[in-house]
From Swiss-Prot:
GO BP terms: translation
Assembly, per entry: Part of the 30S ribosomal subunit. Forms a tight heterodimer with protein bS6.
Domain of life from the UniProt record: Bacteria
Name by which UniProt lists this protein: Small ribosomal subunit protein bS18
Role this protein plays: Binds as a heterodimer with protein bS6 to the central domain of the 16S rRNA, where it helps stabilize the platform of the 30S subunit.
Length: 87
């Protein structure tokens, strides 16, 4: 009788705890884009692996970057969709 090995997922770690020099700042949208889906939703910490403290900071900075128009609320705007459908 063959026994199946149990799958043990790799332990997720917080990128910001591991690298203290990596800033969480609204002025760095290239870093913030890693934590936002294509549709503009903020990815949960159980998926990204960030700790609770840094997840709270990430959420506020992503929202701040959206208000400053450094990040989009969604990936495509409704005007782009209307242009494509009219062609």
């Amino acid at each position: 009788m063959a026994f199946k090995k149990r799958f043990t997922p790799r332990r997720k770690f917080c990128r910001f705890c591991a690298d203290k020099d990596l800033p969480i700042n609204y002025k760095r949208p290239d870093i913030l884009r890693d934590f936002v889906t294509e549709r503009g939703k903020i990815i949960a910490r159980r998926i990204t692996g960030t700790c609770a403290h840094h997840q709270r900071l990430l959420t506020t900075e992503i929202k701040r970057a959206r208000q400053m128009a450094l990040l989009f609320y969604t990936s495509t705007h409704s005007s782009d969709v209307l242009k494509k459908s009219s062609l």
